[in-house]
A protein has these predicted regions:
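ADP-ribose/NAD+-binding catalytic cleft of ART/PARP-like enzymes
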Residues: 1-51, 66-67
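Short active-site loop/helix that positions an aromatic residue
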Residues: 58-72
Length: 151
């Protein structure tokens, strides 16, 4: 899709976006469980997240699993689930139109539950040095007050 063809995903038109959708996390969950907002953020200490975040691409879900695990000091590499939105959703404003125009990561957020319908077991994480680079970059942004989450 070219930049000129990109159209924002809103609560009104999100039905046009087709999955599968993925959610990466540090939590070992069960198929059938609902992911709901209102829990402590994995990315900002002391913040309660008003949204649940998900993506139509596996790569951002891998980052979600690895970062939520690493940033909170949890064991393991994290988990990736196949999820279905139960309500409307919109582009994740934390990634959309930031470094690149549009929503190239196909990342979304919702205030409605996501239902876990499957688990991705066969995924390859990032090399340790690549993951550490990302963590160092995020921590630097946090120190400089630049890692504000729009929730």
């Amino acid at each position: 899709m070219s930049d000129s063809a990109w159209q924002a995903v809103t609560h009104e038109n999100c039905g046009n976006v087709k999955g599968p959708f993925y959610h990466g996390t540090k939590y070992d969950l069960e198929i059938g469980q609902l992911l709901v907002p209102g829990f402590v953020s994995n990315f900002e200490e002391g913040r309660v997240s008003n949204n649940v975040y998900f993506t139509a691409l596996l790569e951002p879900a891998i980052w979600g699993a690895e970062l939520s695990t690493s940033l909170t000091g949890a064991e393991g590499r994290g988990y990736i689930y196949i999820v279905e939105p139960t309500g409307t959703f919109e582009d994740d404003p934390n990634l959309t139109n930031k470094r690149f125009p549009g929503n190239i990561t196909q990342s979304y957020r919702t205030r409605q539950p996501l239902k876990i319908v499957g688990k991705v077991n066969d995924w390859t994480g990032h090399a340790p040095e690549v993951l550490q680079q990302m963590i160092d970059g995020l921590k630097e942004k946090m120190r400089n007050g630049l890692a504000v989450i729009e929730d």
